Amino acid sequence: MKWGLLGGTFDPIHMGHLRCAEEIREIFDLNRIIFIPASHPPHKLDAAVTSFYHREQMVRLAIEGNPSFSFSDVENLRAGKSYSIETVEYFLNKYLKSIEIYFILGQDAFQAIQTWKDWQKLLLLCNFSVLTRPGYESMGLSGILPEEFARQFIYDEAADGYRGPSGHLIYFRQVTFLDISSSDIRARVKNGKSITYLTPDSVRHYIKKNKLYSTE
């Protein structure tokens, strides 16, 4: 079984998240994409984040009806900050060797990977699928990771990815870039502007019903 793990704040989830997930599912023929909202994002400690409950409900509504998409609240079950290394280890320990993990993240996040907890260990635990935008020129791993560490990953032409000493690969894959952001959606709601077609209707209705992001 091949599972993709897609973490994020999802405040709120939007069409960009969903489209990227669908394209990566198709590219790697994944059996499942698991959406994992961060409970306490370590890189956003100073920012106000909507309650986990509301973000969970919005994700559940957004993926409803897609049998390949599922939800996990694993990061809300742990106390303290939400670290990706702990989430990946949770799935590996729970399902042992019955799943192959593809950790999904954007190119901007990957370029900041050295700020993550136990990032070197994380890169050896599972496959990484780095989402790139049209026109993005891959600088290779040496332009992102320390040279000595990057040398452990050898480009595998057949897989079109960088294979590490653990056998897992780091892939760079171009996906459709929808210029949508959660922060823009929040700002639009606050200013009374339409968010139709930026997020699923079910999420839009939930935001309105619960007066999220609004000053009312």
From Swiss-Prot:
Family: Belongs to the NadD family.
Enzyme class: transferase
CDD domains: NMNAT (cd02165)
Gene: nadD
Protein name: Probable nicotinate-nucleotide adenylyltransferase
Protein's job: Catalyzes the reversible adenylation of nicotinate mononucleotide (NaMN) to nicotinic acid adenine dinucleotide (NaAD).
Keyword Nucleotidyltransferase appears in the UniProt entry: yes
The protein's annotated pathway: Cofactor biosynthesis; NAD(+) biosynthesis; deamido-NAD(+) from nicotinate D-ribonucleotide: step 1/1
